[in-house]
Amino acid sequence: LPPKTWFTRVDESPDELFYSSPRFAEHIDKATISNLSDFYKETIREDSEVLDLMSSWISHLPNDLMLSRVSGLGMNDDELSANDKLTDWCIHNLNNEPELPYKANSFNYVLCAVSIQYLTSPIEVFQSVKAVLKDQGQVIIAMSHRLFPTKAVSVFQNINREDRVRLVMSYLELSGFEEISFFDRSPKDADPLWIVTGQNNRI
């Protein structure tokens, strides 16, 4: 397992304080958002049940993708209530409580967009993600190069792009996921987009 020192942060004050004020900003370029939406369109089946982990006011899901449920888990009620893709949401600090507040076998897909760098207990979180996913369910982790430097874990700030991807793939492997894959969907002259996926094969 990765050493705990990898997951220390400059600002170890309660995350609730940092996220208390809503941030209605796009954290990646529009071209990068478009590529992420296209990937979701290609990957997520219609009528699926989806969990948007570490969610905010925008989920990057395409408008023409019809889903039966989109649950959001995040840190700011104003942001989550402004997200018109969500059918339900909850406030939950994964760094304090890595276990997700959902029943087992609840979702076909779990998404985590440009937030993986803030998890201080990623293995525990993704073990819980695996539990709430249905058999053959997928986790989709989208990454770029931007971050809040005071809240991102130290390991993410001290390794290069290739090692960040390898690190996230190791999170999924250590959590029991299979068929772990990497996709580079970076647009030209915009923020990069690196996507890691894993599948929950129970049977």
Question: What does each of the following model-derived ranges do?
Answer:
Residues 35-38, 42-101:
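Class I SAM-dependent methyltransferase SAM/SAH-binding core
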Residues 1-45:
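Class I SAM-dependent methyltransferase Rossmann-like catalytic core
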